[in-house]
Amino acid sequence: VDEWAAAGRKNIFGETVLVQEMQSEGGAAGAVHGSLQAGALTTTYTASQGLLLMIPNMYKIAGEFLPCVFHVSARTLASHALCIFGDHQDVMSARQTGFAMLAEGSVQEVMDLAGVAHLSTIKSRVPFMNFFDGFRTSHEIQKIEMLENEDLAPLIDQEALAEFRARALNPMNPVARDRKS
């Protein structure tokens, strides 16, 4: 995504993607939440330790029915043994947040189900956690069949997208929000 943004590649909406690297994963999750409140479709990429720091904001995002996708490279959590192999204890610790979960087992599945996650979150207003093995799959070099924007664009629920953007915070139409909004 960094390379695509630097090259000025357009996303499915014809816009150049903005990549923002934060100092910590907790800050990244807060930035995702704020960006979603402002009406921007937002996603983040993280690994195990980072996901644990994002859990408080994940509750807020799910509770406010904000459509987003967290892509997670699942690995063993750091301990005295410092194991880098994959397991799902990080993802399982976030299962109670209200995020729907998709798991992949190959590089092609990561590509395919990432699109499914983004399309599904827009339609359902349920945030998604899209995760895969953070050692084997994330290091695998494999040819994949890319999903093209032209193929995905007709699948976007335009009405749900318009409703999401209409709910965005706007200084011209101020509102006070709490957990019931």
Question: At which residue positions do the language-model features occur?
Answer:
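Thiamine diphosphate
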Residues: 1-93, 98, 115, 134-135
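Short secondary-structure transition/capping segments
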Residues: 42, 64-73, 94, 116-124, ...
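Broad hydrophobic/π-residue packing in well-ordered secondary structure
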Residues: 37, 111, 118-120, 167, ...
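Low-complexity, flexible helical/coil segments
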Residues: 27-30, 56, 78-83, 102-110, ...
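Conformationally flexible catalytic loops at phosphate/diphosphate-handling active centers
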Residues: 13, 128-180
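Intrinsic-disorder/low-complexity, polar/charged segments
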Residues: 24, 106-107, 175-180
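Conserved thiamine diphosphate
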Residues: 84-134, 146, 158-161
